[in-house]
Curated annotation (Swiss-Prot):
Listed PANTHER family: GLUTAMINE-RICH PROTEIN 2 (PTHR46766:SF1)
Bias (Low complexity) ranges: 398-424
A single cellular component GO annotation: extracellular region
Pfam families for the chain: Pentapeptide_2, PPE
UniProt-recorded name of the protein: PPE family protein PPE10
Skewed-composition ranges (Polar residues): 428-446
Residues covered by region (Disordered): 398-487
Length: 487
């Protein structure tokens, strides 16, 4: 430096800095190490020279021997240069250590400087009448001399150290041109630009990589980042292929873990196929876990468009269903919507047949509980809408009919409820033996609640707007009578 800062520092600081440091011990140790390295390099030169000399004569003579000799000669030249540089470094380190020892000897002891300052304070404190003025001047002159001695010692040390460092030449990089790195960026790398240990190739960062531009451990290929990848441009661990992101993938451009196929087709983990999302799916457009087929969602389904758990078939929802479009549990039919059904389009439980919507139904279009037959929506009915109606083989006390709506009606068209049996068609009363009855104790067709009179119209209420005689004559006369007002 052109203007060392120590020139402006008092002797208290310069002396303290020189005596507080580690001294010349590290410099002497460095000089010794460089000297030993130079000796080892010279020994290597002699050993390698004796071995390679046989490449130009004897059985090794030939093109391969000539090529090997060219490389060996280059290596020997580098070793010679390195040995010379090591010897120079050892000498310069020892020169700097010697300069430090000389500067330290010329530096004033910190204790002497401290004593001078202490005496100055004492004389100044007791100089009541000016009697200590000469002594104060002597002490101050001694302090200034100490300042000058420290600055001179530091200046000499700075000059000698700068001269020693200037004689050191930068080290050559011939060894790296051989493609072998030993003990610089790692342990042993083969190639160029590798950082780590056991790398073979170029510009690898990490350990035991083979290829170029790998980052991590145990990668084979180029541009891999992670561990144990085989291929190009993989990001993660244990990938095989190209451009995979994740772990354990086999294929191209896959994102996720433990997948096989081509990138952009699946998402999730462990999926095989196209458009799958979730875990462990096989097929097309599945979501969930462990599905096999097309468009399944849920868990452990197989088929097409199933949802729920452990379904097999087409469009089923629920659990443990087989066949098509089932909803519920344990259905094995087509379009069942409840549980344990074996039917066609059933929506209840334990139904067999077709299009049953109740429980324990069997037949076609049954909608009640425990019904058998067809077109029923009652309980155990055939074409009936009541409870406990039977379609055929009714007992003697209960005549058989159809379209009954009562309870218990074995006939037809009964709408009443009670203990009696209606054998007619659509009898809304009680104990009617006829057809479409609505009254009591009548038999026939369309009976009313009370018996009708023999004279037609006698049962119609009168409004007194027409007098009775005129009304009767009007019926007997062929012409239309005139109304007559009442008095």
């Amino acid at each position: 430096m052109t203007s060392p800062h120590f020139a402006w520092l008092p002797p208290e600081i310069n002396s303290a800095l020189m005596f507080a440091g580690p001294g010349s011990g590290p410099l002497i140790a460095a000089a010794t190490a460089w000297g030993e390295l130079a000796e080892e390099l010279l020994a290597s030169i002699a050993s390698l020279g004796s071995v390679t000399s046989e490449l130009t004569s004897g059985a090794w003579l030939g093109p391969s021997a000539a090529a090997m000799m060219a490389v060996a000669t280059q290596y020997l030249a580098w070793l010679s240069t390195a040995a010379a540089q090591a010897e120079q470094a050892a000498a310069q380190a020892m020169a700097i250590a010697t300069a430090f020892e000389a500067a330290l000897a010329a530096t004033v002891q910190p204790a002497v400087v401290a004593a001078n300052r202490g005496l100055m304070q004492l004389l100044a404190a007791t100089n009541w009448f000016g009697q200590n003025a000469p002594a104060l001047m002597d002490v101050e002159a001694a302090y200034e001399q100490m300042w000058a001695l420290d600055v001179a010692a530091m200046a000499g040390y700075h000059f000698d150290a700068s001269a020693a460092v200037a004689q050191l030449a930068p080290w050559q990089q011939v060894l790296r041109n051989l493609g072998i790195d030993i003990g610089k960026n790692g342990q042993i790398n083969l190639g160029f630009g590798n950082t780590g240990s056991g790398n073979i190739g170029n510009n690898n960062i990490g350990n035991n990589n083979i290829g170029s531009g790998n980052t991590g451990t145990g990668n084979i290929g180029s541009g891999n980042t992670g561990s144990g990848n085989l291929g190009l441009g993989n990001l993660g661990d244990g990938n095989i292929g190209f451009g995979n992101t994740g772990s354990g993938n086999i294929g191209f451009g896959i994102t996720g873990d433990h997948q096989m196929g081509f990138g952009g087709f699946n998402s999730g983990s462990g999926n095989i196929g196209f458009g799958n999302s979730g875990t462990g799916n096989v097929g097309l457009f599945n979501s969930g876990s462990g599905n096999i087929g097309i468009g399944n969602s849920g868990s452990l389904n197989s088929g097409i468009g199933t949802s729920g758990t452990i379904n097999a078939g087409l469009g089923s929802a629920g659990s443990l269903n087989t066949s098509f479009w089932n909803a519920g549990m344990q259905n094995a039919a087509l379009g069942s919507a409840a549980g344990s059904e074996a039917a066609l389009v059933s929506s209840a439980g334990y139904a067999t047949g077709g299009m049953s919507t109740a429980a324990l139904s069997s037949g076609i279009l049954a909608s009640a509980l425990g019904s058998t037959g067809g077109l029923q929506h009652g309980l155990a009915n055939v074409l009936n809408s009541g409870l406990t109606n039977t379609p055929v083989a009714a007992p003697a006390s209960a005549p058989v009919g159809g379209l009954d709506s009562g309870n218990p009606n074995p006939g037809s068209g009964s709408a009443a409820a009670g203990s009696g049996a209606n054998p007619g068609l659509r009898s809304p009363g009680t104990s009617y033996p006829s057809f479409v009855n609505s009254g009591s104790n009548d038999s026939g067709l369309r009976n009313t609640a009370v018996r009708e009179p023999s004279t037609p119209g006698s049962g119609i209420p009168k409004s007194n707007f027409y007098p009775s005689p005129d009304r009767e004559s009007a019926y007997a006369s062929p012409r239309i009578g005139q109304p007559v007002g009442s008095e």
